[in-house]
Amino acid sequence: NTRQQVKSDPELNVTAHTPPHSTSHLSQDNAADIKYDLIVLGAVSQTAKKKAQDSFMGMQYAIDSGNRNALMTAVKQTTTQIHGLNQKYDAVTLKSAEVTAARERLKEENNLQIEMGNIILSDSPDRQRFAELSNKHDNAQKMVEIEMEALRIKANTAS
């Protein structure tokens, strides 16, 4: 059975497009599970946010200085960190369908950053495509923030 092979191969969980866990066991509309999930996902996110900010500062410095080699290095480091973050997100066992869906959107947002980095690394960067992805990323980021805030509000109803 192909499905069993996919589940047993942990290497397939590396890409952000492959949900690593079955959703059949997830709770729906359970404030306590949402609260738990937000805590464990938040723990993964906090460390990564600091690293991402540092990487972004490195990219900004490289852009401002016009140093193409420094920019390439910064983009590659950022891409590696984003892949690592997506893997860490996948490694977290969540209990609620709502936070599981939010995690997938976080990974999609991260993948937009990777695509933007790939454009920067290309020999002839497509500025229009980069601008489109940047807008899409900004919108995705806002939507995830709204969704996470709604989940935090729901989680606060848990006793």
Where in this protein do the model-derived segments appear?
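Sec-dependent N-terminal signal peptides of Gram-positive bacterial secreted proteins and lipoproteins
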Residues: 1-2
